[in-house]
């Protein structure tokens, strides 16, 4: 991908995502406090905690697709992640799970107690290019490129889905089509390599 095409991709993707997530997540307003975080104490396998680095965030097309999003495991326990991701009843994702819908945003499941208000998920705002990934912001409270708080959208997911927004999980639908999301995913400018 040429540098010019990569720049155009970043600008267009950021603009589309900004508008979509801003509308879908209530225009940046605070979420209702009625949805408690899911419990991870009894169903989450006890895998070691992780300290995600930029190198952990790879081209989406090298990750495992589940529905509209992509998943991976920073601990090497992809089968445990997939068991939860494919369950119609949901479940608690294991420590080290990585979930991404688009190249510029990610969430990683951290150790129990990391952030009870986010179900122990760490959110990431990423800058992607043909050279790879840079972490722009990370933590329990992350303002992404459009200025919205990641957790405010994900808190709306039904408790059994452990903060992961999927079709019929309780999150607000995105005001962009599945085709647009698929195009953004397919045009991930990062190098394709095995994860």
Residue ranges and their predicted role:
Residues 2, 18, 114-116:
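Intrinsically disordered, low-complexity regions enriched in Ser/Pro/Gly/Gln/His and often acidic
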Residues 2-14:
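Bacterial N-terminal signal peptides that target proteins for export
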Residues 22-24:
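C-terminal motif of bacterial Sec signal peptides marking the signal peptidase cleavage site
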Residues 31, 36-38, 44-47, 65-66, ...:
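Sequence context surrounding c-type heme c attachment/ligation sites in exported
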């Amino acid at each position: 991908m040429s540098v010019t095409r990569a720049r155009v991709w970043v600008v267009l993707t950021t603009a589309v995502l900004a508008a979509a997530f801003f509308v879908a997540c209530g225009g940046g307003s605070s979420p209702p406090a009625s949805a408690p975080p899911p419990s991870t104490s009894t169903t989450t396998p006890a895998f070691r905690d992780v300290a995600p680095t930029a190198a952990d965030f790879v081209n989406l097309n090298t990750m495992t697709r589940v529905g509209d999003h992509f998943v991976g495991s920073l601990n090497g326990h992809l089968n445990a992640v997939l068991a939860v991701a494919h369950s119609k009843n949901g479940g608690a994702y294991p420590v080290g799970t990585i979930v991404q819908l688009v190249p510029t945003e990610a969430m990683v499941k951290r150790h129990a107690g990391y952030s009870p208000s986010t179900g122990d998920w760490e959110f990431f705002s990423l800058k992607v290019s043909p050279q790879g990934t840079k972490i722009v912001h990370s933590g329990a409270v992350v303002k992404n490129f459009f200025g919205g708080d990641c957790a405010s959208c994900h808190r709306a997911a039904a408790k059994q889905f452990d903060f992961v927004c999927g079709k019929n999980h309780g999150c607000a639908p995105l005001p962009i089509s599945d085709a647009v999301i698929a195009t953004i995913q397919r045009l991930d400018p990062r190098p394709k390599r095995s994860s």
